[in-house]
Amino acid sequence: MLLPLACLHGRVAQCLTSLLLLAEPLPRPRRGARARGAASTGAEAAPAAPPAKMAAELYAPASAAAADLANSNAGAAVGRKAGPRSPPSAPAPAPPPPAPAPPTLGNNHQESPGWRCCRPTLRERNALMFNNELMADVHFVVGPPGATRTVPAHKYVLAVGSSVFYAMFYGDLAEVKSEIHIPDVEPAAFLILLKYMYSDEIDLEADTVLATLYAAKKYIVPALAKACVNFLETSLEAKNACVLLSQSRLFEEPELTQRCWEVIDAQAEMALRSEGFCEIDRQTLEIIVTREALNTKEAVVFEAVLNWAEAECKRQGLPITPRNKRHVLGRALYLVRIPTMTLEEFANGAAQSDILTLEETHSIFLWYTATNKPRLDFPLTKRKGLAPQRCHRFQSSAYRSNQWRYRGRCDSIQFAVDRRVFIAGLGLYGSSSGKAEYSVKIELKRLGVVLAQNLTKFMSDGSSNTFPVWFEHPVQVEQDTFYTASAVLDGSELSYFGQEGMTEVQCGKVAFQFQCSSDSTNGTGVQGGQIPELIFYA
């Protein structure tokens, strides 16, 4: 699968670089520590170095000096035995000092003779050889023309860690050249690959992780590839999910593909309106647009498709016209379920977009209004979307004794999950004395930071049922971290309340854990109170 990887890797990886830099990355080392290791990770944009010298050349001056000294001593001894010493000749002029070594990329430096003593373990000594000219027997010229870097390496180390390198150096068709060109791998990614092979250290960054995954796949280093996938999963969110979906398909990573679909389905509107959506390839576009589980309105899908078409026209150097948009979209336009929009959505959106022909627009209007509906080339059935799930944390509810009162105070509870979910809203109790309208503010926080909130109203019918209050968009919640759900209600003072609360609740494949929140000032806790339900997608 190397050919399709190389074809699409460049453009999509460039887009994801900017998107991942916006997401929260894994903890980074301090800048000072980074600076010390920048050369070995390829982070510096060092100027192209002249052809690297082998170890024998590096040590030649010292060896020559030692030989001269030995010869002069031997000559002096012979002279003393043979007879009277001849007058000393004029001293030879001192040789000019050697020119300073040009800057190189990485760990290219001479080590003191005792470097082995300072590194007692095999791992430490082996790590020292990473990107080091000492004993290097092969050099790689990495990167595209005009942006190459020369990297020294040791065939044995690479062959032990990669079957591809083994075949390259020791197989039947082994390379005999001492310099090997690799134009399709980024220098920084190649250095990360080699650093892992020399030292087992994995140093991933948001701006190089995709290129590193490509290199790990190319040279069949599965542990590094797995680390890259794990890094991408932790960085996965709505704004980069579509790009990562495209990459996961190219790299044949089914687990990452599934994680991408979970985000895209649950947060479809945010994913489709992201900049990353406009950078995917057309095949991925078609796969997304045909997705049955997209949890958004069809008008949002249509708008996203038009945005992608405009971006594709720019990439191909075409004028942005309705004709060219139809051309770059191809069959993708006819995968949008336009007839499932409301008549108002169609009239104010797709009908005025100019991308549909007059005949198509006329036929769709007739389909909305006429008894005898015309045949359309667009799908007619609504998407199924996602069915929300509810985690109910109380075993019973009450209202007669110890009446619960909403007094504009905060009811709050903390929760954690054992896998990623998307909180869509909260289920709340209503009035215990008949129909009533409530004003409510719901909020979701993590470590004191507000992730989502909504100020709205809901009607209760006097029953003990819970009433859903939704966030504007589902909120991504990660595993093994406590979040705080809060609600502040104003309205009828008397309401139902929950009893016999549970600290742990299993909802399908998701386990919820609850604990009291210090934000709660109206009496809600684990054992009783309000916020009986969390509404989520998984």
From Swiss-Prot:
Pfam families according to UniProt: BACK, BTB, PHR
Disordered, as annotated region: 29-53, 76-115
Chain intervals with Low complexity compositional bias: 35-53
Domain BTB: 136-206
Protein location: Cytoplasm
Segment forming the signal sequence: 1-17
The keyword Metal-binding appears for this protein: no
One GO cellular component term: cytosol
Chain intervals with Pro residues compositional bias: 85-103
Chief place of localization: cytoplasm
InterPro entries per UniProt: BACK, BTB/POZ_dom, BTB_POZ_BTBD6, PHR, PHR_sf, SKP1/BTB/POZ_sf
Keywords in alphabetical order: Cytoplasm, Signal
Protein name as it appears in the record: BTB/POZ domain-containing protein 6
Organism of origin: Homo sapiens (Human)
